[in-house]
Amino acid sequence: MSLRRPNGFISAGYDPLEVPNAPTIGTASIASSTSVSVTFTAPANVGGSAITGYVATARKTSDGTTISGTGSSSPVTISGLTLGVAYTATVAAVNSFGLGVSSAASNSVTPAEFELYSWGNNYAGSLGLGDTANRSSPVQVGALTTWSNIAAGRASVATKTDGTLWAWGRNAEGQLGLNNTANRSSPIQVGALTAWAQVTSGGNFCFAIKTDGTMWSWGGNSYGQLGFSDTVERSSPVQVGALTTWSQISAGNYFTVAIKTNGTLWSWGKNNYGNLGNGNTDARSSPVQVGALTTWYQVVTGNNHTVATKTDGTLWVWGRNIEGQLGLSDTFSRYSPVQVGALTTWSQISAGGSGFTAAITTAGALWIWGRNNGGQLGLNDTVSRSSPVQVGALTTWSKVANAESHILAAKTDGTLWSWGSNSYGKLGLGDTDNRSSPVQVGALTTWSTLPKMPTSGFSLAISS
């Protein structure tokens, strides 16, 4: 690709109308531990001749040094970057007259390794390790370092930094999205589509949201949990409606709850405990709005209960409550959202399949309530609680993920901790003994991503 005119002079000395205008910058995202992928939109004005290619340039935010990559269309990959260093990117189009005007700078991105680890019950190959042997300590899933999002249910689903979708584990209802019902014991790419941004795995089905705001589902559908106004299983991803405004999704045992970009809350599927939040126990086979509010911020689901926060930091719950998992100081189920206490500082939430809930405040304190038969509340006993209780006095918790009967949590120092039921070694501590208080998992201090895994008997986590 030449950046000079035929007469040998560089384009900088020519009429700027001859070279292309600036492309419109999109986003820069991690493609590998040493490369980034840059998206953009071609300029409307191509200058004096057709565009022949593009040059994307990554600039270190620390000292301004640059490195470039070329391509014929969006996205362009820039390789040879330094691991752990922040960059922004610009893009310029090229025609026969030379290099055009550079775009505005992209978002900042830092190349990093994102390794996926798994442990615990390996039924149907749910750990992705190529076999069905249980593991009681974290084991890396393959050698890839480009995992970005993960979810665990009766199937495991994940996205990579290139936007591709992968799945493995149990597939009896087509929940791996591979157009068949054969189990897989190692990650398999789901179709050829990219731009997958968010995934969630329920009892026997999966959902995903793409970067364009569309929502897709596949797998079991006996209660209408896929949202298609029927109960027909799908063995590959199918778009749910035509909307492009979905921003967040969570799959429970046989129901689904989602938030749109306008802050409205929607639910569908099985509803025997009022877990859809619509004031009754009627199942729905397509999305139905929960109330009229437009201030919903975050939502998670357990087997049969739902937990959500609003933009004002308040915490709300509904659904099954036989174990006190709603945190309302009783064991009565609720069919519509009810606020938990008066706090307005809830920042991260998680719901466990067996009937327990965890939440972190903006101060970094971890609170928990509900069923405690395996010590999953982390309170040094096995007594259930029906209202929130703080786990110790620490204020350094950053992430929490409830599974069927155990918990994973990360601290601000990047360490990973686990507690609760330890059948199959799902706590990752090298044994199968239950723990009723937090115990550190190994010595790594780079745990960055925990999954939604409310129905899981195993563990997944990403280290970066």
Residue ranges of each PLM-predicted region?
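Pro/Thr/Ser/Gly-rich low-complexity, intrinsically disordered linker/stalk tracts
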Residues: S11-A50, L83, F97-E113
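Extracellular low-complexity, O-glycosylation-prone stalks/linkers
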Residues: T41-P75, T90, L99-A105
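Short, flexible loop/turn segments at beta-strand junctions in immunoglobulin-like
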Residues: I78-L83, A192, A342, A393
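Beta-strand-rich modules
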Residues: I78-G100
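Conserved core positions of repeat-based scaffolds
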Residues: S118, A155-A158, A167, F205-A208, ...
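Short glycine/serine- and acidic-residue-enriched loop/turn motifs that recur at repeat junctions
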Residues: N95-V101, Y117-S136, G169-S185, W218-S235, ...
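Short beta-strand elements bearing conserved aromatic residues within extracellular beta-rich modules
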Residues: Y54-A56, L165, M215, L265, ...
